[in-house]
């Protein structure tokens, strides 16, 4: 499992747990004023994927999208004999929501984007120290030592009615044997 898959699986595997935790937050409301009770699972996309519907053209009418791609990687060898290595990876998580023209409430997409951001942040912060991803048989598939969000920027396109955040995420693995 490579690092981008690791981030995607970490988010996917923990999304339903995070939605029950964030459901009912007082500061995030639905159009009718009630607390959010359901947060749809977005489509997670590895930018390198060649699968149909998960590449250049994605239908945002049905689901929000989280696009994950690796920006950089660095390796250092902290010992003289170079028997172990430390790895550091930088990723961008691009959260995207389309405001459809049939939405009667004009701030719905903005609030949905805020909920998606809060859930992604909650998952990454909760699993920030020694995150692990397991396979279907509950066997450890991959792990890291540290994941943290290092920044957030707006990525909106009013003409296309796309709202988004770009999250910068750092992942570190220490003492990996060669």
Predicted regions and their residues:
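Small/polar-rich, solvent-exposed N-terminal microdomains that initiate assembly or binding
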Residues: 1-82, 130-137
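Hydrophobic beta-strand residues in large extracellular and virion-surface proteins
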Residues: 7-11, 45, 66-68, 91-95, ...
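Oligomerization/assembly interface segments of phage tail-like spikes and tubes
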Residues: 83-103, 160-174
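A short acidic/glycine-rich loop-to-helix N-cap element
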Residues: 104-110
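Acidic-leaning, charged glycine-interspersed low-complexity segments
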Residues: 113-172
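Long, contiguous binding/interaction regions
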Residues: 178
């Amino acid at each position: 499992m490579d690092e981008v898959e690791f981030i995607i699986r970490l988010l996917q595997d923990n999304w339903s747990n995070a939605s029950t935790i964030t459901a009912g937050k007082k500061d995030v409301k639905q159009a009718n004023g009630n607390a959010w009770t359901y947060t749809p699972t977005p489509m997670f996309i590895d930018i390198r994927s060649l699968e149909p519907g998960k590449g250049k053209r994605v239908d945002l009418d049905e689901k929000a999208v989280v696009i994950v791609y690796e920006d950089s990687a660095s390796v250092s060898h902290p010992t003289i004999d170079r028997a172990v290595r430390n790895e550091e990876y930088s990723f961008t998580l691009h959260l995207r929501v389309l405001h459809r023209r049939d939405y009667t409430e004009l701030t719905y997409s903005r609030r949905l984007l805020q909920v998606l951001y809060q859930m992604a942040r909650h998952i990454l912060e909760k699993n920030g120290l020694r995150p692990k991803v397991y396979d279907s048989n509950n066997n450890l598939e991959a792990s890291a030592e540290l994941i943290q969000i290092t920044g957030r920027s707006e990525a909106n396109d009013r003409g296309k009615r796309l709202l988004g955040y770009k999250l910068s995420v750092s992942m570190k693995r220490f003492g990996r044997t060669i």
